[in-house]
Amino acid sequence: MTIGSFFSSLLFWRNSQDQEAQRGRMQEIDLSVHTIKSHGGRVASKHKHDWIILVILIAIEIGLNLISPFYRYVGKDMMTDLKYPFKDNTVPIWSVPVYAVLLPIIVFVCFYLKRTCVYDLHHSILGLLFAVLITGVITDSIKVATGRPRPNFYWRCFPDGKELYDALGGVVCHGKAAEVKEGHKSFPSGHTSWSFAGLTFLSLYLSGKIKAFNNEGHVAKLCLVIFPLLAACLVGISRVDDYWHHWQDVFAGALIGTLVAAFCYRQFYPNPYHEEGWGPYAYFKAAQERGVPVTSSQNGDALRAMSLQMDSTSLENMESGTSTAPR
């Protein structure tokens, strides 16, 4: 064995040890930093003020649903456009939190079980709840302030079809108080705004996780991202078909939900088309503080393949007695 081959072997052994140490540090971080057991409480405690604000938003949302809306003047001439049938909801109100909140959380948990990143799980749930609750508060605040009558207001006001008006030509309703109250909450659509808030957040989350915009031309990924948005659109259409909302109500609700969801998502995650769009900001910050380079799973596989290839080349050079050291 030549002196050059000896030093090449020594250098290769040293590099191998450094690589093993680096892998060990990365594995240690993956196992100890990103789990609920080790850092779940710490992450939640760091965002305790956010959770307090969420509780306040819930209280505001409950209060907005208890107070009476503005009883806008409704005259006899206006009743022609408000005489649509009083139908049941195609999408029941109880189902909205199920598909707009519970379903996305189930998806978040599935990704957590695969990657065990507590930052991702915590921030996705927190961002989703902020999206739907802020949307709900905005929607119901506008509902209460505007008091726009629903398309089926006539049958809420006059369930027996017997019309009654005051001296100014305004309606004097004799229907159930709760139905008349609900009849003044047309603008904007709550079903639609909640649907777009929760499902737009889910769509953005999925697009980042599956790298839907990585310029590789996988249309199947795009279909998966579009599906939640399509579901939200169908909910909005059902509100018009059921004569519970005017089309303007649905459009406004969709706009509110989409914008709020996008803003809330970007508070915790990079753009889905970004190289680091697959993870939350906090994940990369934690890794950076520990001096560990973080890549996506795909990039990690590529780096490992390159490392194995370099190791294989070095071994071949050693066996052939060829030095790789600079001459």
Curated annotation (Swiss-Prot):
<comment type="function">
    <text>Plays a general role in cellular responses to stress, may be by attenuating the signal produced by phospholipases. Exhibits both diacylglycerol pyrophosphate (DGPP) phosphatase and phosphatidate (PA) phosphatase activities. Substrate preference is diacylglycerol pyrophosphate &gt; phosphatidate.</text>
</comment>
<dbReference type="GO" id="GO:0010224">
    <property type="term" value="P:response to UV-B"/>
</dbReference>
<dbReference type="InterPro" id="IPR036938">
    <property type="entry name" value="P_Acid_Pase_2/haloperoxi_sf"/>
</dbReference>
<feature type="transmembrane region" description="Helical">
    <location>
        <begin position="51"/>
        <end position="71"/>
    </location>
</feature>
<comment type="similarity">
    <text>Belongs to the PA-phosphatase related phosphoesterase family.</text>
</comment>
<keyword id="KW-0812">Transmembrane</keyword>
<feature type="transmembrane region" description="Helical">
    <location>
        <begin position="217"/>
        <end position="237"/>
    </location>
</feature>
<keyword id="KW-1133">Transmembrane helix</keyword>
<dbReference type="InterPro" id="IPR043216">
    <property type="entry name" value="PA_PP_rel"/>
</dbReference>
<keyword id="KW-0472">Membrane</keyword>
<dbReference type="InterPro" id="IPR000326">
    <property type="entry name" value="P_Acid_Pase_2/haloperoxidase"/>
</dbReference>
<dbReference type="GO" id="GO:0016020">
    <property type="term" value="C:membrane"/>
</dbReference>
<feature type="transmembrane region" description="Helical">
    <location>
        <begin position="244"/>
        <end position="264"/>
    </location>
</feature>
<keyword id="KW-0381">Hypersensitive response</keyword>
<dbReference type="GO" id="GO:0006644">
    <property type="term" value="P:phospholipid metabolic process"/>
</dbReference>
<feature type="transmembrane region" description="Helical">
    <location>
        <begin position="187"/>
        <end position="207"/>
    </location>
</feature>
<protein>
    <recommendedName>
        <fullName>Lipid phosphate phosphatase 1</fullName>
        <ecNumber>3.1.3.-</ecNumber>
    </recommendedName>
</protein>
<dbReference type="GO" id="GO:0008195">
    <property type="term" value="F:phosphatidate phosphatase activity"/>
</dbReference>
<feature type="transmembrane region" description="Helical">
    <location>
        <begin position="93"/>
        <end position="113"/>
    </location>
</feature>
<dbReference type="Pfam" id="PF01569">
    <property type="entry name" value="PAP2"/>
</dbReference>
<keyword id="KW-0378">Hydrolase</keyword>
<keyword id="KW-0611">Plant defense</keyword>
<dbReference type="GO" id="GO:0071456">
    <property type="term" value="P:cellular response to hypoxia"/>
</dbReference>
<feature type="transmembrane region" description="Helical">
    <location>
        <begin position="118"/>
        <end position="138"/>
    </location>
</feature>
<dbReference type="GO" id="GO:0009626">
    <property type="term" value="P:plant-type hypersensitive response"/>
</dbReference>
